[in-house]
Amino acid sequence: MIMSRFSYDVAVAYRIYPKMSVGRPPIFGEDKFKLAELCLKSFKDSLGGLRVKLWALLNDCPPAYESIFTKLWAPEDLVLLRYPGVGAGITLQEQTRILTEQTDAEIVHFAEDDYFYLPGQFHLAVDFLKQNPAADFATPYDHPDQHTTDLHNLFHETRAFGGKTWSSCISTTHTFLAKRAALIESRKLFLKLFQDFEGRTSPDLAMWMALTKKRVFNPVKFFRWSLSHRYWAGSIFLAWYHCWPQILFGRRFTLWAPQPSIATHMVAKLQAPGIDWQKEFQARMAAAGKI
């Protein structure tokens, strides 16, 4: 029997902030603490039997936020890190540093505080990465725009795994899983972008375009989108401006997304398709004794 040299299945760096994001959530729209508590509990329930070490990056958080983590994680599996209201770029740099330097797990997870996970399903993303040598990154989130917009209207490689269809994709948010080796290989790109946008959230679409090398070699789309979809065109520009060495000389990394989704972004207009999320929210709250 071959023993793993890793003591955990997943290493997680979880960013949490006590203020609401720009998009209104589908539940607890006026109470970030309750929203964060629900999301973290859903993440814990999604892990099942996975062995997880978690770093909680508490950015300007009152003490009550720490208690959410200490109630759910054993002290030996939890590291609490406190930041005095720094920009998103700083905590993204910290996530990158933590997850590349740790040697506890070969699969790592960049987590944000506004994602809700389905119970017992997170292992599917972990197993998908472990069992697919060509997969570098994975998102637990089936983005609704993957199915409806011109940006994502291109060939996708698909693989059936764990009762889901996994598709290669262009981009995701700052919530994603990675093989530690792939993250180490792309570390310079991550840190450069996060440093360049230190006080703000870095441009995730531009970052993923540079890594996956999708949509960055199509000048026709660039000029067309410059008129109709400036965010897409602007992301292509930012990818070239900040990440041109990766685009020209780096290898093409792969990013995969599941359908149906494993998690959803807690923005009312951006929920993953095909799942009754309100039903899932109510079920999680009932299980936790919240209703």
Stretches with model-predicted labels:
Residues P62-E106:
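Active-site-proximal specificity loops/subdomain of glycosyltransferases
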Residues F28-C39, P84-L92, Y117, T172, ...:
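Phosphate/oxyanion-binding active-site loops and adjacent basic polyanion-contact surfaces
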Residues V10-S21, N59-D60, P140-H143, P258-I262:
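Short loop/turn segments at strand-loop or loop-helix junctions that form parts
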Residues A105-F116:
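Short beta-strand-to-loop acidic/aromatic patch adjacent to the donor-nucleotide binding site
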Residues M1-D45:
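N-proximal low-complexity "stem/linker" segments adjacent to membrane-targeting elements
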Residues V10, S46-W55, L78-V79, E106:
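Short loop->beta transition adjacent to catalytic acidic/histidine clusters or analogous donor-positioning motifs
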Residues F116-L193:
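Conserved catalytic core of nucleotide-sugar-dependent glycosyltransferases
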Residues R5-S7, R180-A181, E185-I291:
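C-terminal catalytic/acceptor-binding lobe
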